[in-house]
């Protein structure tokens, strides 16, 4: 498994603003990186897979980028509904060892 370092731990943004969340892997994970959104009392929702591919039904204001060890989730035109905790996640190629980042709480100020 890999170590995933996610920053920042918390970020606030105004409605309409932009949020950037970073995730650094301890070794090259070859874009084997997903981003999840989790709201209290709900299961995690897949946003991005393979570093930059948007999951079905996810608004295009969510964008994933990066390669090697450095990855970014950008939320443009932030909406109140985007208030949540976001996690990066990687797995080895067997899928047997899954590693999550520590999470980033996004607070949206109306």
Swiss-Prot record:
Q: Name one Pfam family in it.
A: V-set
- According to the record, the residues making up region (Complementarity-determining-3) are 89-99
Q: Which UniProt keywords apply?
A: Adaptive immunity, Immunity, Immunoglobulin
Please name the PROSITE patterns in this protein's record. Answer: IG_LIKE (PS50835)
Write out the ranges of the annotated region (Complementarity-determining-2).
Answer: 50-56
Annotated stretches, region: Framework-1: 1-23
Annotated GO CC locations: immunoglobulin complex
Annotated InterPro entries: Ig-like_dom (IPR007110), Ig-like_dom_sf (IPR036179), Ig-like_fold (IPR013783), Ig_sub (IPR003599), Ig_sub2 (IPR003598), Ig_V-set (IPR013106), IgV_Light_Chain (IPR050150)
- Where is the stretch described as Framework-4? 100-109
Residue numbers spanned by region Framework-3 = 57-88
Complementarity-determining-1: annotated segments: 24-34
Q: What superkingdom does the record give?
A: Eukaryota
The residue ranges crossing the membrane are none
Cite the PANTHER family for this sequence.
Answer: IMMUNOGLOBULIN LIGHT CHAIN
Further remark = This chain was obtained from an immunoglobulin that had no detectable antigen-binding activity and that was produced by immunization of a single rabbit with group a streptococcal vaccine.
Q: What is this protein called?
A: Ig kappa chain V region 3547
Q: Which organism is it from?
A: Oryctolagus cuniculus
